[in-house]
């Protein structure tokens, strides 16, 4: 218990835990501990140091409470120590959707699509004042956090003329959409399975934005091998389209566009995390690049031509 914050919060708990187990945090800068009591357990989340960590914890608390009240399957929040940003939440076990064998995954995805559709309809009640960073996913967020980050974290040297050309492409193709509630990182490591039930975690970055973005995060997820089959991706995407009653042509256009935005984001994140001492993310870079190349070649020929001339992919 080297962290003084951990010692402090443990001293406030009644009853005291019988054992404290450190858990791996994957891509997060937070620290996670499983507290074992006589007949139960809970997860303690320590925020990253500084103002951002506390702000992130506050968003987690308010959005988590909102989702729970709205019937979304998320971990119950037992305690929130606002002065430190420490959270004590329900223990959902250790099995993420990522861990489920490929041959068993498909049945879960059908359930998850229904949960995603429920989340996205909570627009009018969503606690906007507790969003982290921005209230809305818009063009500027996509451009700075996903497209520019894609080049930055790969250390790709690109000219102003090149950036002007690709910005022109993204401006021209950025679609109009109805605002929905989006998770912003809706992928297999942020979905847990307990007793065959699905739970959504790591929702602190939720905000308003295009529903197709979260669907693309889910179905183009580089962690999941079954989505190397594009026909399966399209089949599940159309299942979502049917559930939310969208125009098929407009929906697919938006899905593919936000799919390439999301894959830019994923690739930049894998490079960034690898450079920050988490090398296990490197193995997902080729998968993400292959899927991005496929989408660009099939649906966005204008952009792939610019990329190929500049040896981007």
Predicted regions and their residues:
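Regulatory N- and C-terminal appendages and interdomain linkers associated
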Residues: 1-22, 59, 279-313
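An alpha-helical support segment within catalytic cores of ATP-dependent transferases
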Residues: 5-6, 10-12, 124-135, 141, ...
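ATP-binding glycine-rich phosphate-binding loop
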Residues: 18-36
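Active-site acidic catalytic loop and adjacent metal/ATP-binding pocket
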Residues: 30-35, 44, 119-120, 168-215
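ATP-binding pocket architecture of kinase catalytic cores
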Residues: 33-137, 158
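A general structural signal marking secondary-structure boundaries and capping sites
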Residues: 71, 116-127, 154, 174, ...
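All-alpha amphipathic helical-bundle segments outside canonical DNA-binding/catalytic cores
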Residues: 78, 136-138, 248-259, 283
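Active-site activation/catalytic loop segments of kinase-like enzymes and analogous catalytic loops
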Residues: 148-155, 211-246, 260-277, 288-296
């Amino acid at each position: 218990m080297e962290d003084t914050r951990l010692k402090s919060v443990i001293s406030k708990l009644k009853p005291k835990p019988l054992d404290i187990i450190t858990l791996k945090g994957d891509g997060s800068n937070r620290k996670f501990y499983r507290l074992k009591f006589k007949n139960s357990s809970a997860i303690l989340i320590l925020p990253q140091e500084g103002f951002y960590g506390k702000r992130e914890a506050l968003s987690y608390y308010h959005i988590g409470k909102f989702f729970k009240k709205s019937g979304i399957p998320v971990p119950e929040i037992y305690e929130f120590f606002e002065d430190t940003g420490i959270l004590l939440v329900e223990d959902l076990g250790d099995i993420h959707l990522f861990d489920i064998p490929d041959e068993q995954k498909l049945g879960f995805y059908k359930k998850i699509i229904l949960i995603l559709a429920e989340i996205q309809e909570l627009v009018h009640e969503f606690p906007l004042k507790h969003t982290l960073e921005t209230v809305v996913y818009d063009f500027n967020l996509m451009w700075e956090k996903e497209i520019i980050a894609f080049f930055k974290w790969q250390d790709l040297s690109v000219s102003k003329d090149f950036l002007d050309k690709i910005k022109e492409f993204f401006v021209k193709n950025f679609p109009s959409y109805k605002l929905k509630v989006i998770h912003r990182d809706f992928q297999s490591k942020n979905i847990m399975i307990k007793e065959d039930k699905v739970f959504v975690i790591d929702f602190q970055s939720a905000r308003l934005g295009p529903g197709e973005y979260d669907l693309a995060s889910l179905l183009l997820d580089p962690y999941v091998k079954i989505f190397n089959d594009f026909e399966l991706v399209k089949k599940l995407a159309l299942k979502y389209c049917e559930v939310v009653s969208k125009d098929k042509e407009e929906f697919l256009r938006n899905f593919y566009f936000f799919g390439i935005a999301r894959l830019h984001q994923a690739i930049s994140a894998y490079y960034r995390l690898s450079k920050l001492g988490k090398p296990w993310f490197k193995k997902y870079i080729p998968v993400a690049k292959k899927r991005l190349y496929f989408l660009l070649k099939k649906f966005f020929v204008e952009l792939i031509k610019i990329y190929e001339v500049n040896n981007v992919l």
